[in-house]
Amino acid sequence: MPNKSPTRTLYALFGGTFDPIHYGHLKPVETLAQQVGLQHIILLPNHVPPHRPQPEANAQQRLKMVELAVAGNPLFSVDSRELLRDTPSFTIDTLESLRKERGAERPLAFIIGQDSLLSLHKWHRWQSLLDVCHLLVCARPGYAQTLETPELQQWLDAHRVFDPQALSLRPHGAIYLADTPLLDISATDIRHRRHNGESCDDLLPRAVQRYIELQGLYRG
């Protein structure tokens, strides 16, 4: 029998506006790391998200909150390249840049939520994503489990893997739907709470909460 491809270290990228970063971002991906054997997660704060309203916090404030949220946690690092752009942040551009840096053979994954999977066909060059990386999908409360059309569902089914070890055997091309905790926390809810003078202490790391207070962010 031919030998299996050697297992390589799996790295993952997790992008977002992070306005602000909160436990709904962090806890599911920490669980995901345990499930699939992730050695490292690179957080990628977006500068100008193409599909969303402009963030309330500026780029440097959002970067600082992300850095504070994961300080001292060896699972995470922060990549600020998207914040240096003056143009919209397209995921495929960043992934192709990172792929060139890390070589063609290293397994690379991009983490998204179930909500993003459902709208993935609206992303810029979405069909090129699996040519560059794997997709790791975290469950999100209240979102459908099937895609919009039979064609999209067939695309998902054709690339889906059920054994997370398969992600480390090839550099890209697979989709894994993870069983992560469903935390009904959103940045929108946190901003609304702040606008209304309500506490957010249980929704985000203490260091991030202190920074928000010091900067006077998300006040009504």
From Swiss-Prot:
Q: What is its EC number?
A: 2.7.7.18
| Name of the coding gene | nadD
Q: What PANTHER family does this protein map onto?
A: NICOTINATE-NUCLEOTIDE ADENYLYLTRANSFERASE-RELATED, PHOSPHOPANTETHEINE ADENYLYLTRANSFERASE
Q: What Gene3D superfamilies would the database entry show?
A: HUPs
* NCBIfam families (UniProt xref): cyt_tran_rel, nicotinate (nicotinamide) nucleotide adenylyltransferase, PRK00071.1-1, PRK00071.1-3
Keyword Nucleotidyltransferase present in the record's keywords: the answer is yes
Look up and give the organism this protein is from. Yersinia enterocolitica serotype O:8 / biotype 1B (strain NCTC 13174 / 8081)
| CDD domains assigned to the protein according to its UniProt record, in alphabetical order | NMNAT
UniProt name for this protein = Probable nicotinate-nucleotide adenylyltransferase
**What GO biological process, any one, is recorded here?**
NAD biosynthetic process
Does the entry feature the keyword Nucleotide-binding, yes or no? yes
